[in-house]
């Protein structure tokens, strides 16, 4: 029987990228939600290479009187999950909550996640109710969730929602993973003994635009497929066997038809032969593309370049210049 450790301190990790319009409300609402917990807390805001005034606003927030905000400034944009991992490196709490900066997931839900984690869960996920996103975003999210469920066997309903709570030992385990492509909700579930999901409210985006374009969603799907499983490689082997068998069978059939109906029939089947040829070539290109994705990821991991580069950390009581590679 595992001992359930009480939650004494809560750390909230929020990646920020060009969110200057939403930052004042985000900070106020998140601080109010944490104050209502009756526990120690800290709010870690990670600037992921913003080109607007977000970084300066974070510095000012950390230096404000009675601030609980730790600002972490990355030297450029590394992506949402790398920014969160940077925040994980500086947390001091027993429970770590991740939250997006766009306020679509209300910070007021934080006490509910803490209460659920207090029941002994390692990971508390969330499911967005009445999603206020476009049809394309919702459809893409459903496809990604189904893909993840099938490849991982974990019956979590909404992997795309970043409003989640993790026990400290889960975060420590994730920090020991050094692969370049990281999808935090999936990685956390690999180490979690007990995980649960709760429904949460989902609001419309009031400020700015979504940072996930069509191409970024496509890249995310490629990342998920290639970092989760080697099943596509096995499927390629199976597909190759099927195509080879079909091609051999078709060749035998064409020989028989040629002998039975003469050369005239053979000439009339030229277009079918081209169609079959293009089908095989297309299958080869698909296979080469998937193999290239895996080889590219192996290459990136072998180079062992830093996942992110922390330029500066500003704590409530002092400003500390740090240059770190992770």
Curated annotation (Swiss-Prot):
It comes from the Bacteria. CDD domains: DPM1_like_bac. GO terms for molecular function: phosphotransferase activity, for other substituted phosphate groups; undecaprenyl-phosphate 4-deoxy-4-formamido-L-arabinose transferase activity. Disulfide bonds: none annotated. It is an enzyme of class 2 (transferase). Residues 1-235, 291-326 are cytoplasmic. InterPro entries: ArnC_tfrase, Glyco_trans_2-like, Glycosyltransferase_2, Nucleotide-diphossugar_trans. It is found in: Cell inner membrane. Pathway: Glycolipid biosynthesis; 4-amino-4-deoxy-alpha-L-arabinose undecaprenyl phosphate biosynthesis; 4-amino-4-deoxy-alpha-L-arabinose undecaprenyl phosphate from UDP-4-deoxy-4-formamido-beta-L-arabinose and undecaprenyl phosphate: step 1/2; Bacterial outer membrane biogenesis; lipopolysaccharide biosynthesis. Its EC number is 2.4.2.53. The chain crosses the membrane at residues 236-256, 270-290. It catalyses: UDP-4-deoxy-4-formamido-beta-L-arabinose + di-trans,octa-cis-undecaprenyl phosphate = 4-deoxy-4-formamido-alpha-L-arabinopyranosyl di-trans,octa-cis-undecaprenyl phosphate + UDP. Keywords: Antibiotic resistance, Cell inner membrane, Cell membrane, Glycosyltransferase, Lipid A biosynthesis, Lipid biosynthesis, Lipid metabolism, Lipopolysaccharide biosynthesis, Membrane, Transferase, Transmembrane, Transmembrane helix. One of its GO terms (biological process) is response to antibiotic. Coiled coil: none annotated. SUPFAM superfamilies: Nucleotide-diphospho-sugar transferases. Belongs to the glycosyltransferase 2 family. Catalyzes the transfer of 4-deoxy-4-formamido-L-arabinose from UDP to undecaprenyl phosphate. The modified arabinose is attached to lipid A and is required for resistance to polymyxin and cationic antimicrobial peptides. NCBIfam families: PRK10714.1. This is Undecaprenyl-phosphate 4-deoxy-4-formamido-L-arabinose transferase. It comes from Escherichia fergusonii (strain ATCC 35469 / DSM 13698 / CCUG 18766 / IAM 14443 / JCM 21226 / LMG 7866 / NBRC 102419 / NCTC 12128 / CDC 0568-73). The gene is arnC.
